[in-house]
Amino acid sequence: DHIPPEKNLVWKAAKLLQERCHITDGIDIYLEKNIPAAAGLAGGSSDCAAALIGINELCGLGLTLGQLCDLGVTLGADVPFCLQKGTMLSEGIGEILTRLPDLSPLWVLLIKPDISVSTGYVYTHLKLDEITSHPDTEHLIDCIRRHDDATLARGLSNVLETVTIPEYPILAELKRFLSDNGAIGSLMSGSGPTTYGLYQDES
């Protein structure tokens, strides 16, 4: 409700396809957002991906998944990932994707506090030279292949927490709450503020 249409990624996706593919017909788009904005859940990127796929099919453009990804990354770093299904290793700014084995079925509990976090602000204030701990990507991939969920969950980390959590200490409290209540791992999602816990069973 607070995003002008011309700044919405769905509008940008439609405009991009219109210009690149010389679409002359009009398209009516109704957007119902179920993922909160500025929540760290890639809601805008997933909407953008859906728009690219939908318009490609609706207008019979015949663009391949690779072509859609090439267009999508110009709109948002997460868009190529949202265009594809399954577990991926994402490198570069998000445009280099390597498919991984499916994760084991896990329960995920999301907590979205009444806070909105600007992704741009977080990346602008991220000090890469001060980050001393990085996730062991190869080890985590090995855990995925072996379905070692507990070790995988313990090894997860998010460097963006170094910016968002000092601004909103309640996120550290939420992580502790989730861990204290049975989560095998808890982490901030994306640039925040949504925090999630991973559980091996529903109870």
Residue ranges and their predicted role:
Residues 1-27, 38:
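N-terminal beta-alpha supersecondary unit
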Residues 10, 39-65, 81:
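DPxDG-like acidic metal-binding loop motif
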Residues 19-28, 54-74, 201-203:
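Phosphate-handling active-site elements
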Residues 27-40, 182-186:
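Short pre-catalytic strand/loop immediately N-terminal to key active-site residues, enriched for Gly-Thr
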Residues 43-44, 188-193:
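Glycine-rich beta-strand-to-loop/alpha-helix junction loops that act as flexible
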Residues 60-101:
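Glycine/threonine-rich beta-strand-loop-alpha-helix active-site module
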Residues 84, 89-185, 200-202:
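Conserved, helical-rich catalytic subdomain that frames metal- and/or nucleotide-binding sites
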Residues 196-198:
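Short hydrophobic/aromatic beta-strand micro-patches
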